[in-house]
């Protein structure tokens, strides 16, 4: 999205709903919700649209994600046409974001429920640049722990009257700790044949990457990190930002290209896992085998 929410600018289903929660920021001890099992721990911020803001092995207290602002999370973000809006004094576009806007205003959390191994959020997003609550948009998120894998389901409904042009859409945007520097994927033409993986350290701004096996990962110096698999998505965008003061991050987003048009509903599934790249690839290969 943006420098903060994804696509960088050099100028930069149905669970039962609960009563809407207040728009005011929760107290710190009420803001976070964590789920964990014997493999991993995942955390959500109510003040950021219920988006995923924490991920680690269960025996670690080191967050592998970056949540420096309301754009840096694992979250939904979509793009429409330029609309005269300004992000930090630079031209921007129609951009509903699950977490909130660039000035720190939270999205409106309509529902947030959880069990021991799952969580659901329903959110009215904000326009990243203007901060307007976009009542014509609804974002939903279902998260489920499945052993060493996190299953994520996202759904976006756009009831606006304007038809926007086609854009690259983040599915989803994912911001990671800057220590995870190396981007790893398979980018050749023989997927799931144990072919050699490609490795790179992205720069700034966005680089576009083929991911023929529909997964991509960032790893640290120890070769371990976070991988994401989005079925049928074969392209991603990535960058690393180094701005200091906690803003350093590694970013990646699998990409689909489509337009926001009246009464659009777009839903997709993604999977996360932790480990070295061989383990990450093997776990995603098992998911592929299970698919019809």
Where in the sequence are the language-model features?
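Boundary at the C-terminal end of the N-terminal hydrophobic targeting segment
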Residues: 8-9, 14
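Bacterial N-terminal signal peptides
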Residues: 1-8
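Residues within well-ordered beta-strands of beta-sheet-rich folds
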Residues: 34-36, 43, 120-122, 142, ...
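Active-site/ligand-binding surface loops and adjacent short beta/alpha elements
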Residues: 171-174, 179-242, 250
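Extended, loop-rich substrate-binding clefts of extracytoplasmic carbohydrate-active enzymes
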Residues: 84-147, 161-163
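Acidic (Asp/Glu-rich), glycine- and aromatic
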Residues: 56, 137, 146-189
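Solvent-exposed N-terminal domain segments of exported/luminal and surface proteins
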Residues: 31-107
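Beta-strand-rich recognition/accessory modules
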Residues: 15-40, 47-48, 62, 68, ...
């Amino acid at each position: 999205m943006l420098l903060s929410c994804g696509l960088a600018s050099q100028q930069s289903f149905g669970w039962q709903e609960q009563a809407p929660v207040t728009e005011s920021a929760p107290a710190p001890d009420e803001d976070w919700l964590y789920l964990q099992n014997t493999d991993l721990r995942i955390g959500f911020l109510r003040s950021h649209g219920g988006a995923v803001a924490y991920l680690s092995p269960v025996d670690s207290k080191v967050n592998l994600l970056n949540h420096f602002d309301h754009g840096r999370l694992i979250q939904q973000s979509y793009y429409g046409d330029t609309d005269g809006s300004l992000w930090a004094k630079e031209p921007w576009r129609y951009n509903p974001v699950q977490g909130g806007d660039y000035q720190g205003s939270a999205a409106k959390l309509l529902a947030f429920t959880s069990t021991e191994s799952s969580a659901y959020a329903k959110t009215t997003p904000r326009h990243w640049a203007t901060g307007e609550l976009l009542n014509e948009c609804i974002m939903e998120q279902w998260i489920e722990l499945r052993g060493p894998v996190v299953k994520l389901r996202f759904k976006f409904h756009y009831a606006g009257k304007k038809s926007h042009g086609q854009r690259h859409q983040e599915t989803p945007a994912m911001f990671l700790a800057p220590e995870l520097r190396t981007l790893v994927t398979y980018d050749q033409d023989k997927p799931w044949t144990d072919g050699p993986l490609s490795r790179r350290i992205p720069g700034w701004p966005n680089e576009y990457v083929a991911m023929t096996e529909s997964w991509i990962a960032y790893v640290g110096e120890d070769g371990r990190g976070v991988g994401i698999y989005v079925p049928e998505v074969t392209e991603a965008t990535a960058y690393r930002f180094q701005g200091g003061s906690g803003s350093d991050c590694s970013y990646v987003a699998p990409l689909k290209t489509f337009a926001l048009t009246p009464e659009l509903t777009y839903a997709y599934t993604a999977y996360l896992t932790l480990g070295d790249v061989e383990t990450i690839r093997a776990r995603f290969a098992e998911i592929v085998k299970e698919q019809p």
